[in-house]
Regions:
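ATP/NTP phosphate-donor binding region
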Residues: 1-61, 73, 101-118, 126-137
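Short glycine/serine/threonine-rich phosphate/pyrophosphate-binding segments
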Residues: 14-15, 69-74, 182-186
């Protein structure tokens, strides 16, 4: 088995956890590598170092080390190549982690193929001018649409399958996957949705209304979002650098053509993980 490691070295624990993973993989006889940018930090591990595309295209699995943000970033790189990913927690909650840093002995199950794949729905967002796509991205958790001037409310029109659905006066709207229902969506008052229930969630942020609530749509829904006032909006995918939706343009959000495939080595289910992780916040 060929494995690519993608650690987030801004996490103080990540370097040590990654070194431990390297030791475990070496003992198990697995081939593992990093992308070239990690050469200085991990040259002593005996790993190979390759350009990003070569490493990811040629691997059998990806191991991401860090918190949820790091794992989600790596999951997108893996998903577009139809590669499975295992998250190892070196952050705080890390809902997406399949292993904690004290469970590296379980990596033997990965090498032996003793695991299941947890296939998670992803979203694709296109920024369009008419029928022309002028920008696009994918997300594992959510995409956030706000006014370009973040401190101001904005009027946002939302259409469902090409039919005008609602207009929100709010700070923004959040479109989430079931995976993202335990992230920003949860903080914004959205429902927790089991990831096995494929669906798309829409949550208005601080709506100036007595009735606006989160909504759950079927997985083949296509949501179109644009400014009701001709203002410039911003849309960001999983919290990364936002793209601009200029006046006369709109964002179209729908199910992606592939899934994020998370490796599950342990037998804990969604409710087990939810209770364990959120109990840490009490």
């Amino acid at each position: 088995m060929k494995i690519v490691l993608i650690p987030n070295l801004t996490r103080k624990e990540a370097a040590g956890v990654t070194a431990g993973i390297c030791q475990s993989l070496k003992k198990l006889g697995a081939d593992f590598c990093f992308t070239d940018e990690y050469r200085n930090e991990f040259e002593h591990t005996g790993a190979a170092f390759l350009p990003e595309n070569e490493a990811l295209d040629g691997c059998d699995a990806v191991i991401a080390v860090g918190g949820d943000g790091s794992i989600i970033h790596a999951a997108k790189l893996a998903a577009v190549r139809h590669k499975p990913i295992l998250g190892v927690n070196a952050g705080r909650l890390a809902f997406m982690a399949g292993l904690e840093d004290n469970e590296l002995h379980l990596l033997s199950r990965l090498i032996e193929g003793d695991y299941t794949l947890d296939k998670r729905l992803m979203l694709k967002m296109n920024i369009k001018r008419g029928n022309e796509i002028i920008g696009s991205d994918y997300c594992v958790n959510d995409c956030l649409i706000t006014n370009e001037e973040k401190q101001r409310m904005t009027a946002i029109d939302v259409s469902l399958n090409s039919s005008r659905f609602n207009s929100y006066l709010c700070d923004g709207v959040l479109i989430s996957t079931p995976t993202g229902s335990t992230a920003y969506s949860l903080s914004a008052g959205g429902p927790v949705v089991d990831p096995e229930l494929e669906s798309i969630l829409l949550t208005p942020l601080c709506p100036h209304s007595l009735v606006d609530r989160s909504l759950i749509f079927r997985p083949d829904a296509v949501l179109t979002v644009e400014s009701a006032e001709g203002n410039t909006l911003c849309i960001s995918s999983d919290g990364v650098q936002p793209l601009t939706i200029e006046s006369g343009c709109y964002a179209e959000v729908s199910r992606a053509e592939f899934t994020a495939n998370f490796i599950r080595i342990k037998s804990d289910n969604f409710i087990d993980i939810l209770y364990k992780k959120l109990a840490q916040r009490r």
